[in-house]
Amino acid sequence: MAKVIKFDQEGRNAFLKGVNTLADAVKVTLGPKGRNVVIEKSFGAPLITKDGVTVAKEIELEDKFENMGAQLVKEVASKTSDVAGDGTTTATVLAQAIYRQGAKLVAAGHNPMEIKRGIDKAVETLVAELKSISKPIKDHKEIAQVGTISANNDKTIGDIIAEAMEKVGKEGVITVEEAKAMETSLETVEGMQFDRGYLSPYFVTDPERMEANLENANILIHDKKISNMKDLLPVLEQTAKSGRPLVIIAEDIEGEALATLVVNKLRGVLNICAVKAPGFGDRRKAMLEDIAVLTGGKVISEEVGFKLENTTMDMLGQAKKITIDKDNTTIIDGAGAEGDIAGRVKMIRAQIEETSSDYDREKLQERLAKLVGGVAVIKVGAATEVEMKEKKARVEDALHATRAAVDEGIVPGGGVAYLRAMSTLDALNLPTEQQFGVNVIKRALEEPIRQIAQNAGVDGSIVVDKVKNGKDAFGYNAADDEYVDMIQAGIIDPTKVSRSALQNASSIAGLMLTTEAMIADKPKEEGAMPAMPGGMGGMGGMGGMGGMM
């Protein structure tokens, strides 16, 4: 297929047009007075959103060269969202400002490679400064403030996120689901829960709630199917003597073995419950090993030389309480040694660091949470489907941003941190051409606060000057149209978000500035439609078919 190639200024102008089109659509959502963007959907109602990355993902331009520019800036937004969970609009605004200023300098004959070097050195200095002014975040109130800001100033969401993080800890898993009701609520699960229920309803001990509740129970963990009762008999006899309940977790329990367990349960000989093992394949083996470590037992597996018929009581795990319903099993207060659990946690953390698959990482984090923290579910409620989707996206954003704040601390929000960090750039002593790159960054750092002010209907230049003349956390509160101490007012940004937005924006903008040629497929020329074949003219006679009605 033929290609079209654009060079130098012609290509950069097309890039700039695409960058501006995407950034202008995204940046109207910035700040507390950010506007909504309505996105048409081919099925169902239009989507109304104030989330920058959602807007960016929907944009596809007709001109291929302009679209290249737009897609590269889209990459800035999605990368920032992946790393920090928020700051997508800020990153887009910064990328547009850096590229726009840099493109002017390149058009005026400056060396793009030197400008890029200047930009990189400036960003390196700024990141170090942002980290030094960062304030660690610890208490419930500060976590709630970060959550509130990231959820577009929705205090309810901020409070729920803070409560969830307090309950499950830093390592815990917090998931977001749609609720059936109007209210947004929080549910937490203590202990280890996995998504497998009892194999027969006859194991239930609480008929009203259809649950099996076993206290001070022994746990038999086996990695194969159990169908032969003979293999189980020795361990059942030992359990009957001990008088403690028994939970059997195995790949499956069927036929004669399951029938015998049910009969013994109904006769009151044994308080017992059988559950299928969670997961599949290698992940199942790992999860059974987790359960064994948590409860202080062993996985009865022929791979390591343990046979089911030779199982002794010291191989069984123990837990203070086990609750099993038809879908889930929850093990509370397992008897595993703290040192063993810590070793297992360390191993899973190492696997999280090494894996390149997002899916594997998510599953490993779930396993980690089940061992050390717990699981919390935020159920998002709303009046309509459209509001539900918008609110759920905000909760997910706020959750990511709050985690980022706990990781690296917080800085004054509303674009103030960038203005305060800017002063460190004055100390840089670089060659003249590189200094132009530093100046590009200086101008770009004003852009987020300028845009926040403009979205609030205020002149951005006046706000920038006034905030620059202030000190420390002094900044502009666009929500109330007043100048305040941003930290005291609870207007804060996670350091990770501010840092990632700047690094990603400068990286892509620098690449675009140093691009000299752009190649795209040549559009197909739409010629005149081919004439109808001559023989089809006789179809005109079909008009007479009307009389057949």
From Swiss-Prot:
Query: Which positions in this protein are listed as binding ATP?
Result: 29-32, 50, 86-90, 414, 477-479, 493
Where it sits in the cell: the answer is: Cytoplasm
Quote the InterPro entries the UniProt record gives: Chaperonin_Cpn60_CS (IPR018370), Cpn60/GroEL (IPR001844), Cpn60/GroEL/TCP-1 (IPR002423), GroEL-like_apical_dom_sf (IPR027409), GROEL-like_equatorial_sf (IPR027413), TCP-1-like_intermed_sf (IPR027410)
Q: Name one GO molecular function term.
A: ATP binding
Q: What is its main location?
A: cytoplasm
Q: Which GO terms describe its cellular component?
A: cytoplasm
Q: What is this protein called?
A: Chaperonin GroEL
* Protein's organism: Geotalea daltonii (strain DSM 22248 / JCM 15807 / FRC-32)
Which lineage? Bacteria, Pseudomonadati, Thermodesulfobacteriota, Desulfuromonadia, Geobacterales
Gene that codes for this? groEL
